[in-house]
């Protein structure tokens, strides 16, 4: 039978490992960290990565139950975020759930580290209503604190319909972000693929 203290030790070991690794990479010159990606990790859960119309393009439907968008930062995630701000590292909120993003903003405000937050590759929620994309209040928050939102060049995240007109939606997304948050907020954020249809 597992001892509950073993779980605590394991959790503490994970936390210590996460913070040690973070400091190691910071000391090697790593400037920022993307806290979440396609699958849950020790820090934060991700949003489901595909719009409903794209489910037919892969085996994503069978994986739907693996994402819980009602989750926020883990305890380890909170400690990592606080340590990042203490070190002065930048934090990329791309792929984080809305609940995790809200908590990151709160921690940033508490530590006076708002300028450390950015989104490297996202869209605008009002252009394509996916929880992956930033809502208007988040875009304004970034604008008020010197942050940027890199526009992803991927139709799945910037277009509400299955289309080949990617450039049109890039333009709409940039225009929307400028109208909501100012011209200093939108940036090029192609992600690793750097493409649109």
Regions found by a protein language model. Give the residues of each.
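Active-site pocket scaffolds in enzymes
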Residues: 185-197
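Extended, charged catalytic domains and RNA/DNA-binding interfaces, predominantly
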Residues: 1-187
């Amino acid at each position: 039978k597992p001892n509950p203290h073993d779980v605590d030790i394991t959790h503490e070991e994970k936390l210590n490992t996460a913070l040690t690794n973070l400091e190691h990479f910071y000391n090697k010159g790593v400037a920022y960290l993307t806290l979440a990606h396609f699958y849950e990790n020790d820090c934060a859960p991700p949003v489901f990565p595909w719009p409903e119309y794209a489910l037919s393009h892969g085996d994503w439907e069978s994986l739907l139950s693996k994402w819980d968008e009602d989750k926020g930062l883990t305890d380890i995630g909170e400690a990592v975020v606080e340590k990042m701000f203490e070190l002065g590292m930048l934090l990329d909120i791309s792929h984080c759930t809305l609940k995790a993003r809200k908590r990151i903003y709160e921690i940033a405000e508490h530590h006076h580290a708002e300028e450390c937050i950015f989104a490297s590759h996202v869209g605008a929620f009002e252009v394509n209503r996916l929880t992956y994309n930033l809502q208007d209040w988040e875009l304004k928050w970034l604008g008020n604190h010197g942050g940027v939102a890199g526009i992803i060049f991927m139709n799945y995240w910037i277009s509400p319909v299955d289309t080949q007109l990617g450039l049109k939606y890039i333009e709409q997304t940039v225009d929307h972000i400028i109208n909501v948050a100012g011209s200093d907020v939108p940036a090029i954020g192609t992600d690793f693929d750097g493409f649109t249809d």
